[in-house]
Design a protein with these regions (language model features):
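Membrane-embedded and interfacial regions of multi-pass energy-transducing membrane proteins
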Residues: 1-177
Length: 177
């Protein structure tokens, strides 16, 4: 509301960017990783296939989230959650999102591996439980989502560094959404 002026415009977009990233990406995906681990290791009564990979993914997600938040809070990456080109953010903004996504991908791979371990060790009989099936569906969707994000965020990172001179904003919007 322009007449209310709760925040100045620059602080509004800073808060909106941080809120969008933290609530729509960080919180939801950390929760999804927890669901994947629960649906595989706990519900199936199996061990995690690669605990070190799972912890590595967690720390990468945490590092990426922290890096992106610092870039936003420094004030040079208030591009809102969608971060549309041609609005340029700090390279650390894009690098943080990429690291976060790689960490999530490691978590998804650990989930798939845990399903294989559970099947090999016969920790369950018949088909997988419904909750685990739902988590499997979410994990498959996550792989495709992360791949689409990489397709557009890696060139955007290179553009923000200056290694690529132009990114088509329409292509960015189509791939992002």
């Amino acid at each position: 509301w322009p007449s209310v002026h709760l925040l100045p415009a620059d602080w509004f977009y800073l808060a909106l960017t941080a809120h969008g990233f933290d609530v729509l990406l960080v919180w939801i995906i950390f929760f999804e990783m927890a669901v994947l681990y629960f649906a595989s290791a706990v519900i199936l009564g199996s061990r995690l296939a690669a605990p070190k990979v799972a912890w590595g993914g967690f720390w990468l997600m945490l590092l990426g989230a922290g890096m992106t938040n610092v870039a936003v809070l420094q004030g040079d990456s208030t591009v809102m959650f969608t971060s549309y080109v041609p609005m340029r953010a700090s390279p650390f903004f894009y690098l943080g999102i990429i690291l976060f996504a790689v960490g999530a991908l490691l978590g998804v791979c650990c989930f798939f591996g845990t399903l294989v371990v559970a099947k090999a060790e016969k920790t369950y009989e018949g088909s997988i439980p419904l909750v685990t099936f739902g988590a499997l569906t979410a994990a498959i969707i996550a792989v495709f989502t992360i791949a689409c994000g990489a397709i557009i965020l890696i060139p955007t990172l290179l553009w923000s560094i200056g290694l690529i001179s132009y990114i088509d904003p329409i292509m960015y919007k189509i791939i992002w959404w």
